[in-house]
């Protein structure tokens, strides 16, 4: 997710949806307010693209569909644009927003990390169908996973390129080397995936 600019005008979710339909800029919606989303960095886009490419290949043989950055997710009176998500529920048919994703991924930035780890973590965990909420750092090799065990939410953290994240929905294994392929990190000359 990118940095946000808040509008002070309170609005209903219906007013937000009508406003968003005509807007040239994407806005997330929480607490009755629209928040404009700013652009994302090249690293952010590459990480999202790497992840989407993997999930697209995995989902081809299933009823699941991966989405990247422009599909909204609605949780009660809150609407976000996750960086990547996967929805498998055939009843979740709205062409502009989903309510039952099984996987939600946010690529962290300094401007949004607090929201992604706080407000969004709380709200996403309200989605009954959600199996995992994944947070990916774009400034270091680090992937944090909040996974629903069926009874409680568990936290896992990965920080080595040789690590792999196992997902139940869709059923796949994501290597950190694949997530960070062709990513240059600040303060190093290393670029993952190129020799």
PLM-predicted stretches and their roles:
Residues 1-195:
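Gly/Pro/Ser/Thr-rich low-complexity, intrinsically disordered segments predominantly at protein N-termini
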């Amino acid at each position: 997710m990118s940095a946000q600019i808040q509008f002070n005008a309170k609005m209903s979710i219906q007013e937000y949806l009508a406003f968003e339909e005509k807007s040239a800029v994407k806005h997330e919606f929480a607490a009755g307010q629209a928040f404009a989303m700013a652009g994302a960095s090249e690293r952010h886009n590459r990480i999202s693209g790497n992840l989407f490419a993997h999930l697209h290949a995995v989902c081809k043989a299933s009823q699941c569909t991966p989405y990247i950055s422009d599909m909204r997710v609605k949780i009660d009176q809150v609407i976000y644009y996750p960086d990547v998500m996967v929805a498998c529920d055939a009843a979740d048919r709205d062409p502009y927003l989903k309510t039952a994703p099984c996987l939600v991924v946010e690529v962290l930035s300094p401007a949004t990390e607090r929201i992604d780890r706080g407000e969004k973590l709380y709200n996403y965990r309200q989605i009954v169908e959600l199996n995992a909420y994944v947070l990916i750092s774009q400034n270091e090799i680090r992937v944090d996973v909040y996974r629903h065990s069926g009874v409680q939410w568990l936290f896992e953290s990965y920080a080595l390129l040789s690590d792999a994240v196992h997902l139940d929905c869709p059923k796949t294994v994501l290597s950190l080397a694949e997530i960070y392929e062709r990513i240059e990190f600040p303060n190093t000359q290393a670029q993952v995936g190129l020799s």
